[in-house]
Structures are given as C-alpha cells and as structure tokens.
Amino acid sequence: MVSPLPVLEDKTLFARGDTSITPAPEEISRLVIYLVKPSRYDDDGYLVRHWRGVLPSNTLSCLAGLTDDVVQRKVLGKHLKISTVLVDESVERMPRRKILADAGRKGTRAVVCLAGVQTNQFARATDIALEYASLGVRVMIGGFHVSGMTAMFPEGTPDIARLTDAGVTVVAGEVEDRWAALLSDVVNDRLQPLYNFLATPPELKRQPVPRVKRSYMKRFAVSNLGTIDTSRGCPFACTFCTIINVQGRKMRCREASDLRNTIIENYNQGINFYFFTDDNFARNKNWESILDLIIDLNNEGRHITFMMQIDVRAYKIPGFVEKSKRAGCSQVFVGMESINPDNLKAAGKTQNDVGDYAHMVEVWHDAGVAVHVGYIIGFPFDTPESVADDVRRLADEMKVDQASFFMLTPLPGSVDHKRMVENGEEMD
C-alpha cells in the first residue's frame, strides 16, 4: 500500500479574493508558463504526432483564458511580465531548448504545466514531467487521469507517488478561482506536491472563458474551429464514466452574458464553428439563453455554427431541437452506447430507452441535424454475433449518420475501474 499523499487545500488561499495571493518577489520580473497538451504513445511505443490536428484542446484554451485574467488583474505584481506558450505535442515538438533557457535565466520563473492529461496520454506526460523535473524545471500535471485516481483512491496510488517523489506537482480538480494562487506559488518557489480541489468544484458563472489563440489554431486542419465548455458535470450515473467523479453530478454552468464577448472576439479572428465540449449541453440550465445568444449573433450578420454532445432524451426538452436548429447546430453527438437493454442496465445507463432510439434520430433529422452516436463494445452481454447485428441495426433501423466505436475500458476515475482494482482483476 502506498503511503497517503498530503491533501493540500486551504480555502482562504484559493478564494477568488486577491488578498491571499502573494505577489512575485521584486527580483523575479518574468514568469513563463508553458501550457502543454502531451501526445501519446502508439501500440509500438512510438510518439504520435500529426502534420495537422483535428480538434484543439479546450483545456489549453481554458488555461489561456485564466492566465489572461491573471495578467489583466496584475495580482502577481505590476512589475511581473507573464508570457504564455501553448504547446500541443500532437502537432508540434516540445520546445526543449527554450524551456531550459527560460528556466535557467536570472530573474525568470518558468513552469511546465501538463494540462488535461487523459489516461492514454499519462505515460507520455509522466516521461515529460520526470525529464524536466530532473533538470530542475518546475512541473505541474493535471487532468482526468490524476484527478480520477485521486478521486477514487484518496489514500494514494503508485503512479501519483512516483511523480510527487520526483518533485512534480500534481493538481487534482479544476483550477478556476485557484489559478492565480498556483502561479503565486510558482513565482514564490513554494509549489506543493499535491493540490486537491475535487471537493469544491468552482462555479462557472463570471469565470474567464476559454480563449482561442490564433497562433495555436494555425496548426489544425480546420482553422475556423474553436471549443468552449458552457457547463461541466453530468447528472447521470454511468459506471464507465469519469466525468461524474471528477467534475461531479451537479451541473455548473456559464451564462450567456459571459460568452458573448469571447464569441465575438473569436469571430473577428476567423473562428465561427464551435464544438461545445460539455459532456451534456442539454442539461445546462442556461441552454436556451446561450442558443438565443447565438441566434442573435447570427441575425447580426455573423454566421456561427456548432456541434454539441447530448443525451438520448434531450430531444424531449420543449423547444430544444427547434432552437438548436435555429442557432446553427449542424451535428449532435449522442451517447447511445448500446442497443441491448441488458448492457445499458449493467452500465447504470438507465436513462436510455432502446425503443426510442429510432424516433430520436428521426426528430433530429427532421430538423436538419446530423446524428453521430458513441457506441461501446465489450459490455457483459455482447458477443461477436450480437455486435455485428448491432452495427447493421444502427445503419438500417436507427439510421444514424455516423458511429464511433469504443472498447469498454475501465478508465481511472470510473466506478468500473475502482471495482476492478478492489477485486484484484488484471488490467493492462
């Protein structure tokens, strides 16, 4: 058993108020923040990198927006110059020489922030973190893997302990309301091994909105595509899901007024197509005012379209489909997961009604919206024959436009993963 890791959360330190944040000492005049989305290794151990990316990282955009807010408020001192460098390792190399030069420069603090790290990226993120920490660079790591492991195993796990033992700072949970304080710890050279914010997820009202950086978007095939999370959390209880144990089951939502200026600024730099990264936009209590905002912007002469993730029952919300169409929704991603009721019951996905799937797709099609479904293979009642028949039915009976197939995976942060660990089941 790994010895327990310290849980470091001082609610006064991480309050929005600036009185708890210590400015940078006078001898520190520059802070360079490398916001890094790590890539992943393929099955043969090679690093995956593309000539152009497909979907930009919303986490990088969130942290860029939070950093811009810190800069504007000058809470770390009027003398401190803050620079932000976005690095998406899936489309570019780590700027190793520049990072080491900044880290060694007198009067400068540099920090590498491995952001939004998912489980399939964690091995690569660990290698990056250990390499730079061994060279004396300050390193922080956050995202769903470390947050999920901390949420489900608060006593500590070997992968987290390996990082903290090497001097890497682990951040579990969301950092709105805490980012300035974390950066204060960077410039004052007092980073802690672990910050656990999972118990107090921040409200999103009046928070800085994700900022799309044009220089970052140039590395993507669709350069007019941006991301925004208008809400976080999900009210359902699927056993394979990590969202509910990291972001919680209580929906936390942005308001339309918080989004307006950012959408206009993004439009002025060529961003007019969005992917709402909310796990379930339909359960955002402010969905109608947000769609009204987009309708108004379109009526003002801006042509804005978007894709969103929703649940299978979203079409039953009065006015939701019609207003989504008017606002410019081109595609919905629906968590169908299975057309076998026994599989859905086993996964705790009781909100799905297989008998209603075809009608749901028809309603969205009647509105001119394409339906892309997520489908999981490997549930207890799947067989090779049943899966083949499911694929046929998706096309012939459900008439979905597109399906993405996923192998059932016990992701850290899910109930499935915790159960398998506690039962001593083997996992790769």
Question: Where do the protein language model's features map onto the residues?
Answer:
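Acidic, low-complexity intrinsically disordered segments
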Residues: 4-264, 268-269
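Short amphipathic alpha-helices and their capping/turn segments at secondary-structure boundaries
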Residues: 16-29, 317-328, 359-361, 391-395
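Flexible glycine/acidic-rich beta-alpha junction loops that bind and position SAM and/or redox cofactors
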Residues: 42-43, 146-153, 178-179, 236, ...
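Short helix-capping segments at alpha-helix termini
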Residues: 74-77, 132-137, 296-303, 367-368, ...
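Short, electropositive alpha-helical surface patch
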Residues: 94-99, 289-295, 364, 383-400
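Structural recognition of alpha->loop->beta junctions
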Residues: 155-180, 323-332, 389-405
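Radical SAM [4Fe-4S] cluster-binding motif and immediate context
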Residues: 206-372, 377-379, 385
